Amino acid sequence: MNWLTNVVRPKIRNILRRETPENLWIKCPDTGQLVFYKDVEQNQFVIPGSNYHMRMGATARLRSVFDNETWYDVALPEVTADPLKFRDERKYVDRIKDARAKTGAHDAVKVGYGKLEGLGVVAAVQDFDFMGGSLGMAAGEAIIRGLELAVEKHAPFIMFAASGGARMQEGILSLMQMPRTTVAVQLLREAGLPYIVVLTNPTTGGVTASYAMLGDIQLAEPGALIGFAGARVIEQTIREKLPDGFQRAEYLRDHGMVDMVVHRHELRPTLARLCRILTKTPLPAVEEPAVVDDDAQDIEAVATEIVATPPEPAPPPAAPQA
């Protein structure tokens, strides 16, 4: 009996077992509801019902912004992978390899150029899944290159921020990207081009202390965590209890730090409208279909029938009687 239970039965179970993909279902962080992954993906990673905004990868974000889901990937400068030969529990180069394998991206920032409702724009997206969207040399160079391209193309620049801050494995070289990106934003301003920032969940640390809070227009997604230091650190420093919703997008909007909180489904038309207003670009001409008037059709049909069927000649007048 032991042979049957210990050897044969496990083998049968292994044969009949069907593996279930890990990402088949998604649990809503707000309500705990289990939602089918494909439904969330088709809904732009917004949980149906609760409207909780999940994190969005860089490629999916660019796909949701540009017309026909097409754009040109901007070639980005190469940087030294591990300038400080940094190691904590693991080597920094090993962490980068794992992040690249997980996301399929070269680093935390992806830049694209394409059309947004017919208007050429440059967009940069931080991917939080790549080492927390941390700002390092590669990310800094990517943002700067995107801003330079916007000046070259005379196009608006849209920044989708999502980061835990500067990348500690690169030390001062990471912190250097804060003033460098700030200078690049200023060059865009001097060219008279709009810089629009979309703050997504989360945007914290050195990113909020630099380019993420320099937008001509500051947008945020609902419920996004936005701040420099964490709420717990602030409470321990000031020895006071923070108000409810502190550092959330809605709180920042109510206190003047953010211009608008925009649902992800409304983000694309909102960005297009802002870009057109700030660049004084008229709406593209739309050929309106000819309006068919049923009454006019009836009149035309009757007129055609009258022309095609001439009236019968009138009978000759009768002779007068004597």
UniProtKB/Swiss-Prot annotation:
- Which gene carries the instructions for this protein? accD
The pathway noted for it is: Lipid metabolism; malonyl-CoA biosynthesis; malonyl-CoA from acetyl-CoA: step 1/1
From the UniProt record, list the reaction(s) this protein catalyses.
N(6)-carboxybiotinyl-L-lysyl-[protein] + acetyl-CoA = N(6)-biotinyl-L-lysyl-[protein] + malonyl-CoA
User: What is the name attached to this protein's record?
Assistant: Acetyl-coenzyme A carboxylase carboxyl transferase subunit beta
Q: Which family is annotated?
A: Belongs to the AccD/PCCB family.
Tell me which species this is from. Rhodopseudomonas palustris (strain HaA2)
**Gene3D superfamilies (alphabetical):** 2-enoyl-CoA Hydratase, Chain A, domain 1
The UniProt entry, under PROSITE patterns, shows: COA_CT_NTER
Query: Cytoplasm: is it a keyword of this entry?
Result: yes
EC number(s)?
2.1.3.15
Primary enzyme class? transferase
UniProt xrefs under NCBIfam families: accD
PANTHER family in alphabetical order: ACETYL-COENZYME A CARBOXYLASE CARBOXYL TRANSFERASE SUBUNIT BETA, CHLOROPLASTIC
